[in-house]
């Protein structure tokens, strides 16, 4: 599977805005809306992801709420694949299956429709989100996919906040690809 050159990574990273002290003091938020609003950069990113995954014989793209929906749905349209959302609790209207995960203080949960992959036996799936930090949501999502019996080919992120260790943690569950590592 293909990766970007250092020059191309610098180009994409330059289209992402840093917001200091958001959502709380001490945090530098990676705002991808500036990349999404730049038609050339967004197309470049999608061209790269399409090229990386076009020969993987995937059946579905799974996107993690909420910015994973943007990237995942766009990529699924490019690859002519179905898109399946991973949602926060009580957001899906049909019967769901869930996976809890730990937060610094407490727990959270992700859900999917229980029949999301019923149309294909042992589907090959790509998990997509905009960013991986500590990896809690991504790991819970990968565990949820395993409960549903899918073949998780890879988890793909636009940005990996490497020092927070999420991608390293997730590699115990599945292969991980990050377009940009910061």
From Swiss-Prot:
One of its GO terms (biological process) is adenine salvage. SUPFAM superfamilies: PRTase-like. Gene3D superfamilies: 3.40.50.2020. GO terms for cellular component: cytoplasm. It is found in: Cytoplasm. It comes from the Bacteria. Keywords: Cytoplasm, Glycosyltransferase, Purine salvage, Transferase. Its EC number is 2.4.2.7. PROSITE patterns: PUR_PYR_PR_TRANSFER (PS00103). It catalyses: AMP + diphosphate = 5-phospho-alpha-D-ribose 1-diphosphate + adenine. HAMAP family: Aden_phosphoribosyltr. Catalyzes a salvage reaction resulting in the formation of AMP, that is energically less costly than de novo synthesis. Homodimer. This is Adenine phosphoribosyltransferase. The gene is apt.
